[in-house]
């Protein structure tokens, strides 16, 4: 069980760190250099979307970290939130795998790193979710 708990905390912590990191992505990768500034509404919309996504990813993952002990007991809600985040990461991994995450130039390493890490996190979260499903079935028997 220690390995499963380690996997749970690792995946939720990593998800939270991605949420925190995403707050700084527009500046780190100079998003605004690629956008025509005459479309200020577009820039504001992208900023709002990124900020809300980052806050939801970071906040939800923080909740999962705080509810870690509950997830390994009979608390169904914490498992359901974990399942929801698993679906999000599976969708993200599918997008990164089958659709180019962004043009590879000028920062190809970032696109490849996103592909590898989102696929790895999705697989790990899927494994943890399957373990939770097994635990829930065993409790009901």
Residue locations for each model-derived region?
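Individual transmembrane alpha-helices with interfacial aromatic-anchor signatures
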Residues: 87, 107-121
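Membrane-interface helix-loop junction between the first two transmembrane segments
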Residues: 24-36
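Membrane-water interface at the C-terminal end of transmembrane alpha helices
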Residues: 118-139
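Membrane-interfacial loop-to-transmembrane alpha-helix junctions, especially the N-terminal start
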Residues: 8, 75-84
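Juxtamembrane helix-break-helix junctions at the cytosolic face
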Residues: 61-79, 100-103
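Cytosolic juxtamembrane helix and N-cap/initiation of the first transmembrane helix
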Residues: 1-18
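Membrane-helix boundary connector in multi-pass membrane proteins
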Residues: 94-112
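Core segments of alpha-helical transmembrane spans in multipass integral membrane proteins
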Residues: 17-19, 26, 41-69, 83-91
């Amino acid at each position: 069980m220690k390995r499963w708990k380690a996997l749970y905390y690792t995946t939720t912590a990593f998800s939270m760190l991605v949420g925190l990191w995403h707050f700084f992505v527009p500046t780190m990768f100079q998003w605004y250099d690629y956008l025509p500034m005459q479309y200020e509404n577009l820039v504001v919309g992208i900023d709002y979307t990124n900020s809300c996504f980052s806050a939801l990813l970071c906040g939800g993952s923080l909740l999962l970290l705080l509810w870690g002990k509950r997830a390994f007991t009979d608390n169904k809600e914490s498992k359901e939130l974990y399942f929801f985040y698993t679906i999000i990461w599976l969708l993200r991994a599918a997008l990164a795998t089958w659709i180019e995450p962004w043009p590879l130039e000028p920062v190809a390493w970032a696109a490849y790193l996103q592909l590898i890490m989102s696929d790895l996190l999705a697989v790990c979260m899927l494994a943890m979710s399957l373990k939770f499903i097994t635990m829930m079935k065993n409790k009901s028997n």
